[in-house]
Amino acid sequence: MRTEYCGQLRLSHVGQQVTLCGWVNRRRDLGSLIFIDMRDREGIVQVFFDPDRADALKLASELRNEFCIQVTGTVRARDAKNVNADMATGEIEVLASSLTIINRADSLPLDANHVNTEEARLKYRYLDLRRPEMAQRLKTRAKITSLVRRFMDDHGFLDIETPMLTKATPEGARDYLVPSRVHKGKFYALPQSPQLFKQLLMMSGFDRYYQIVKCFRDEDLRADRQPEFTQIDVETSFMTAPQVREVMEALVRHLWLEVKGVDLGDFPVMTFAEAERRYGSDKPDLRNPMELVDVADLLKSVEFAVFAGPANDPKGRVAALRVPGGAQLSRKQIDDYGNFVKIYGAKGLAYIKVNERAKGLDGINSPVAKFLTADIVEAILERTGAQDGDMIFFGADNKKVVADALGALRLKLGKDLSLTDEDKWAPLWVIDFPMFEDDGEGGLTAMHHPFTAPRDMTASELKTAPEEAVANAYDMVINGYEVGGGSVRIHNGEMQQTVFGILGINEQEQREKFGFLLDALKYGTPPHVGLAFGLDRLTMLLTGTDNIRDVIAFPKTTAAACLMTEAPSFANQAALTELGIQVVKKAENN
């Protein structure tokens, strides 16, 4: 039906007769001439109808936005004064000789001239996806997946599919369950990841595996999460963690070079402890120049319990955050930031305004100045590198609260005061995570997952001091987003059972949930290492949006609903009866 795409026409096509198919993006009726912007997936081109082709001109008068049409015409160069430098096709136009209206469009529920609500965009997603910026994002996503496949093929990885209907295993989030009609009362689980299957593939001898795969997690959602999402899943045998990171870093550098024309360079490597200490986060945004600086040793003897308490507590921390130019902040702004950090458990926000650095104590303005000596102030100014016009905020509490509160404040100030370089790319690897973390109930939970190996520990050493274990794990972070993560896997049955035991999984439960894995570990398991990237999040970064729904064709809302199809929906009673399922209504509160 077509000979060319609208958005691909250029001066090289001048004089050629072309047939185009697409939609009316805009129509301008000048009486004797009618102009339309005609759009397809590749872009927009101007088409005009003149009186010499009366039938086409008459039919064009009926056109409205989003009519689906076919146009045949001749490509012409525009006069210099009419060239549109903002359009890829702005140097040419098409003189239409014939027009076919394939399908008309009713009045549109989305307004092309205004910002539509996200609810409306998701309900009429098929119309929303016609917008050039949305089409471009999905085209970029397709390019990314193509680049990934070619790269992985070139590096000897095999694309192997793993099951979608599998067994429920604890991986950190709730499973989506699928009832079995054949096995009444039993359920499959949709995979949260192909984790165990890819490890089993390593045990099967496929030493380089990858897959671009759907995963499912029934968890509370936010802007950068979906109940179903896509991973670039990778596993290798007989490779070390640094070797795997080298290959995966090369993949990401390749994507940025091909999609953005940007060379990311070598990625710095930072330990979890350093990231938390300097940035208050295990996924630091290095575009932001501010850092947390420890000052507890300077404040142990002050007559101010808010500082002295945490400064003298082994589990406490006092840290300072220097904000360049922050002395301009008003009292109301400071109060607002004080309320902001309370969200993260902080009790408030002490501060020092640096007016004249050279005057030391006399050159600052601070509600806590009366508790500080000239020597202490000088030491704080020196350690933080404060200059005239800067602000220093303080966090004083247990280590987690200080990291969380000042880490979040750092990001907010970076954005509010334009301190974060939005034109920069800042990737890094974060390594050496704690193996376990407190589950809040007196037990331990795996920081990554239960199949991650500890670094340089035997099973007996791990059993003796699990809280000291460092995971042989790593995350890739770009501009404050965790885009991928992985680890060295446990390939020894004794170690795997030890980890299960530390996590409170008794031997009977181990056999019930992971018997197949424990059996497989008995038969010559190779050392293996893996990683998974979030394709949606990578695409989000590469297309410059901050909402993951913008890079998924048919996403869910933050309530895990599809507004277009109205999923989830009620199942009919016959289907439920056949599955042996009875829906129990939740009792209403009186």
Curated annotation (Swiss-Prot):
Transmembrane segments: none annotated. ATP binds at R217, D218, E219, Q226, E482, G534, L535, D536, R537. GO terms for molecular function: aspartate-tRNA ligase activity; ATP binding; nucleic acid binding. It catalyses: tRNA(Asp) + L-aspartate + ATP = L-aspartyl-tRNA(Asp) + AMP + diphosphate. GO terms for biological process: aspartyl-tRNA aminoacylation. Residues 195-198 are annotated as: Aspartate. It holds the Pfam family GAD. SUPFAM superfamilies: Class II aaRS and biotin synthetases, GAD domain-like, Nucleic acid-binding proteins. Its EC number is 6.1.1.12. L-aspartate binds at E171, R217, H448, R489. GO terms for cellular component: cytoplasm. Catalyzes the attachment of L-aspartate to tRNA(Asp) in a two-step reaction: L-aspartate is first activated by ATP to form Asp-AMP and then transferred to the acceptor end of tRNA(Asp). Homodimer. HAMAP family: Asp_tRNA_synth_type1. This is Aspartate--tRNA ligase. It comes from Salmonella typhi. The lineage of its organism: Bacteria, Pseudomonadati, Pseudomonadota, Gammaproteobacteria, Enterobacterales.
